Amino acid sequence: MSYPGNYGFIPSTLMDEELGGDGDALDILVIAESLETGDTISVIPIGTLLLNDSGELDTKIIAVPADPKKQVIQATDYQTFTVKYNMAQRIVENWFLNYKGLGITKLIGWRNDAFAMQEIEKWRIPQ
């Protein structure tokens, strides 16, 4: 089953294992029409999905395109996403809870857009 959005990573980030990360770039799911593999776009983070994946913290930034013409939902913050698009939020959550098989990934919880921005800054590679 395909992802419920455009799945990728945030450039210039690395979740350092010594700091509790998974050793990869920060994951992102952009809720938008299908993008080409390798496309880079500006986004607005609207929330963070925190998961336990086989005992390891797995952080997913949820975002929408910054360009209003590319947005398929009119949510640019966590409050609007959870109230106006609660079913979309549940689809994203359920997909990530089941994509590796039943019971492998467990929900820690959702966090807001401010938390998403903090995570992006936390894992940004110093230039």
Please provide the spans of the model-predicted regions.
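Hydrophobic N-terminal alpha-helices or hydrophobic patches in metabolic proteins across all domains
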Residues: 1-127
